[in-house]
Amino acid sequence: MSVPTVLEKILARKAEEVAERSARVSLAELETLARAADAPRGFARALQDQVKLKQPAVIAEIKKASPSKGVIRENFVPADIAKSYEKGGATCLSVLTDVDYFQGADAYLQQARAACKLPVIRKDFMIDPYQIVEARALGADCVLLIVAALDDARMAELAAVAKGVGLDVLVEVHDGDELERALKTLDTPLVGVNNRNLHTFEVNLETTLDLLPRIPRERLVITESGILNRADVELMEISDVYSFLVGEAFMRAESPGSELQRLFFPERGVPVSGSTLD
């Protein structure tokens, strides 16, 4: 019997989590909460508007820990981090809500969104329509669909549920086969290329560059994972990739927003402040 990969372990636990949550709060109750939630802020539109100007469209991630790195940030106050990111020039936020493997929480998404005006994606392993409705009830503006975690029928079902509740969809791929499935199954304009292999958690920036020629121009490409310095940013920009999802590089910095500005908007200079998060 083969040893389960990291992704397989996460998905097995996620199925248990969905069962536990749906036993506590029914889908009908969630749908009521979703209808009462603040209107979506337009996640895809915000990225598209920035990319049209050939300016970095940064999805700044709020992430306390990961399976591969353990705890990434000890001083973890989502509302303060969100404000710092907004000040530093982020276009959108990504908030980890997975509890068991990333030490995330639903409350972190709510706190971050309430602290700023940026659109927010719920970063989690979505496998069930329940989670999609739950995301909207929490106030999310977008959800992540990971092709490696879903078959085509479920992927299409989740995207349809997302559209029904007013959520944008970011579909995430890692290789050519996943990209082909995503393009065939979904019409979302947002295609994220994860440079991290979710089975091994190894990172290679060439993943984005290799897949880029196969992605239609009308789709917006977001490079995810492994962007750590200006050279990485410039490598993507010369290839006409202007949207980035970055977490660890910011989370390890004393001031996440200042690090965002340093990496993506160096011409603005880095703000000097007494606060570690300003």
Curated annotation (Swiss-Prot):
Residues of the signal peptide: none
What is the name of the gene encoding this protein? trpC
Query: What protein family is recorded?
Result: Belongs to the TrpC family.
The protein's matches in PANTHER family, at most eight in alphabetical order, are given as: INDOLE-3-GLYCEROL-PHOSPHATE SYNTHASE, TRYPTOPHAN BIOSYNTHESIS PROTEIN
Instruction: Give this protein's Gene Ontology molecular function annotations.
Output: indole-3-glycerol-phosphate synthase activity; phosphoribosylanthranilate isomerase activity
Q: Which reaction is this enzyme known to catalyze?
A: 1-(2-carboxyphenylamino)-1-deoxy-D-ribulose 5-phosphate + H(+) = (1S,2R)-1-C-(indol-3-yl)glycerol 3-phosphate + CO2 + H2O
Q: Which InterPro entries match?
A: Aldolase_TIM, Indole-3-glycerol_P_synth, Indole-3-glycerol_P_synth_dom, Indole-3-GlycerolPSynthase_CS, RibuloseP-bd_barrel
Q: Which pathway does UniProt place it in?
A: Amino-acid biosynthesis; L-tryptophan biosynthesis; L-tryptophan from chorismate: step 4/5
Gene3D superfamilies xref list: Aldolase class I
Q: Which GO biological process entries does UniProt record here? A: L-tryptophan biosynthetic process
EC number, as in UniProt:
4.1.1.48
User: What species is given as this protein's source?
Assistant: Pseudomonas fluorescens (strain ATCC BAA-477 / NRRL B-23932 / Pf-5)
Name the domain of life: Bacteria
> Which protein are we looking at?
Indole-3-glycerol phosphate synthase
Disulfide-bonded cysteine pairs: these are: none
Q: Which UniProt keywords apply?
A: Amino-acid biosynthesis, Aromatic amino acid biosynthesis, Decarboxylase, Lyase, Tryptophan biosynthesis
Pfam families under this entry? IGPS
